[in-house]
């Protein structure tokens, strides 16, 4: 299984250095929780890992090779869920899931989309426009992608935001199963998360 490695990463925004000298190594079955106060660069680091930004210094390697030189071989193995979710108000829950999956390279039929949304506790709401859903329900629509994406690396920015206790347990279950099958996860969260059988690696940004 591949590894994800950060080597001496530096992030600069404007005239401010958010972090420097960041190193980590994530292996199969591993979960890395990125921690730090607001403005410390947590989201910036995740954006680097998914190719939306570049480090001012340092390298990010996937199985020993810089991610920029891998192109689709890396990006096709990764799913990124940002903290905003990307749910479109005028589309139904099922349309949102199918379109976001298609953008990630997954041709999702309506039956599988329905099953994923039902698993996330949205049974009966699949055909409702997203604008009538609560923030927690909209977040569940976004997180349903994890059931259908089929990628080894998940990069999750505040996945537990706006979720109630039952939804948090659902997400914890998804994470546990993904790690049990050799998946890898990098995530930020302001909440403590307990994952059965997982050694959580914590990366502190200051």
Curated annotation (Swiss-Prot):
Q: What is any one of the record's Gene Ontology cellular component terms?
A: plasma membrane
Q: Which reaction does it catalyse?
A: heme b(in) + ATP + H2O = heme b(out) + ADP + phosphate + H(+)
Keyword DNA-binding in annotation:
no
- Gene Ontology terms, MF aspect: ABC-type heme transporter activity; ATP binding; ATP hydrolysis activity
The answer to whether UniProt assigns keyword Glycosyltransferase to this entry is no
* Primary location class: membrane
Residue intervals of the ABC transporter domain: 4-205
State which Enzyme Commission number(s) the record gives. Answer: 7.6.2.5
Entry-linked PROSITE patterns: ABC_TRANSPORTER_1, ABC_TRANSPORTER_2, CCMA
Q: Identify the InterPro entries for this entry.
A: AAA+_ATPase, ABC_transporter-like_ATP-bd, ABC_transporter-like_CS, ABC_transptr_haem_export_CcmA, P-loop_NTPase
What membrane topology is annotated for this entry? Peripheral membrane protein
Query: Which Pfam families does the record match to this protein?
Result: ABC_tran (PF00005)
Q: Name one GO biological process term.
A: cytochrome complex assembly
Superkingdom of origin: Bacteria
UniProt keywords, alphabetically: ATP-binding, Cell inner membrane, Cell membrane, Cytochrome c-type biogenesis, Membrane, Nucleotide-binding, Translocase, Transport
Instruction: Give compartment(s).
Output: Cell inner membrane
Enzyme class, first EC level, given as a word: translocase
Q: What does this protein do?
A: Part of the ABC transporter complex CcmAB involved in the biogenesis of c-type cytochromes; once thought to export heme, this seems not to be the case, but its exact role is uncertain. Responsible for energy coupling to the transport system.
Task: Indicate the family of this protein.
Answer: Belongs to the ABC transporter superfamily. CcmA exporter (TC 3.A.1.107) family.
Note the subunit structure: The complex is composed of two ATP-binding proteins (CcmA) and two transmembrane proteins (CcmB).
List, alphabetically, the NCBIfam families matched. ccmA, PRK13538.1
Q: How is this protein named in the record?
A: Cytochrome c biogenesis ATP-binding export protein CcmA
Q: What is the protein's species of origin?
A: Nitrosospira multiformis (strain ATCC 25196 / NCIMB 11849 / C 71)
UniProt lists the gene as: ccmA
């Amino acid at each position: 299984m591949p590894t994800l490695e950060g080597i001496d990463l530096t992030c600069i925004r404007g005239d401010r250095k958010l972090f420097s000298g960041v190193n980590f190594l994530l292996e199969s079955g591993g979960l890395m929780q990125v921690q730090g106060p607001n403005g410390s660069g947590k989201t910036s680091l995740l954006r680097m890992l998914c190719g939306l930004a570049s480090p001012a210094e340092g390298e990010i390697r996937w199985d020993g090779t810089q991610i920029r030189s891998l192109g689709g071989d890396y990006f096709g193995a990764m799913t990124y869920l940002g903290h905003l979710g990307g749910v479109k108000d005028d589309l139904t829950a099922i349309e949102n899931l199918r379109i976001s999956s298609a953008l990630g390279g997954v041709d999702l039929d309506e039956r599988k989309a329905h099953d994923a949304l039902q698993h996330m506790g949205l049974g009966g709401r699949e055909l409702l426009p997203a604008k009538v859903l609560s923030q927690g329900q909209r977040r569940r629509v976004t997180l349903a992608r994890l059931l259908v994406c089929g990628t080894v690396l998940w990069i999750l920015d505040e996945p537990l935001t706006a979720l109630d206790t039952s939804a948090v347990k659902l997400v914890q279950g998804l994470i546990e199963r993904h790690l049990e099958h050799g998946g890898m996860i990098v995530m930020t969260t302001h909440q403590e998360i307990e994952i059965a059988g997982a050694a959580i690696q914590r990366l502190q940004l200051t």
